[in-house]
Amino acid sequence: MTAFNVVRFRVKPGREQDFLDAHRKMNRDFAGVKAIKVIKSGDRSYCIIGEWSDMADIVTARPAMIGNLDAIREMLEDLGGGLGLTDPVSGPVVLDLK
């Protein structure tokens, strides 16, 4: 069943273009990935949204995705509230309302 992962970030002032450029160059060749989108959700706030064939593919790709995060970590600002630099969630689609 299709699954999604979403990761929320806040980029340090002056680093937004670096953040976007880094994502253009990142490894996205993950088994089972259908689409990866970057959305701007606010001032210096972004979300990465990935669509996957199933949850197992997300789990398998996590080490490589963490490697991608390591490449941009210094561009990110702490989200506060004990979250750290990212706010990730993932799960299977339970209702498809096309």
Tell me what each language-model feature is.
Residues 3-9, 47:
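Active-site-flanking beta-strand signature of metal-NTP-handling nucleotidyl enzymes
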Residues 1-2, 98:
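Absolute protein N-terminus
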Residues 8-21:
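Short, surface-exposed ligand-recognition loops at beta-strand->loop->(often short) alpha-helix junctions
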Residues 85-98:
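Short, low-order "capping/linker" segments at domain edges
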Residues 12-13, 56, 98:
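A short, structured loop/turn motif at beta-sheet edges
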Residues 25-38, 51-87:
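An amphipathic, aromatic/His-enriched active-site/gating alpha helix that lines ligand/cofactor pockets
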Residues 46-50, 95-98:
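Short, solvent-exposed polar/charged micro-motifs at secondary-structure junctions
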